[in-house]
């Protein structure tokens, strides 16, 4: 497997009325293809800031994020769209992140519909099943 995401010495600081807040300090890791990563920690420890920085939603103070070998900081707005379509953050409050009234299949299909990548429902449903298989989610959960 090859490295899909490489985060090197990532830092994110915010200026506040009380001084500088070190939200993310020297975070480094590599994520291989076909793997997932969960970031766990106390409230306010920088998990969301880390995710937003990796996605390029906010600029890092220092360090670099390489996705498929390219530095995310050097991507133009149009180049960032395909990058963001390949990554997703699910924030810690599942009730605000995932609609409990939607099926698992619908939750997975929704971003594909919004992005317009699979307009044909048959192809979209096939892709949803592939994604479920990739993460080991049994078909019986598709409509749960």
Predicted segments with their positions:
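ABC transporter nucleotide-binding domains
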Residues: 1-144
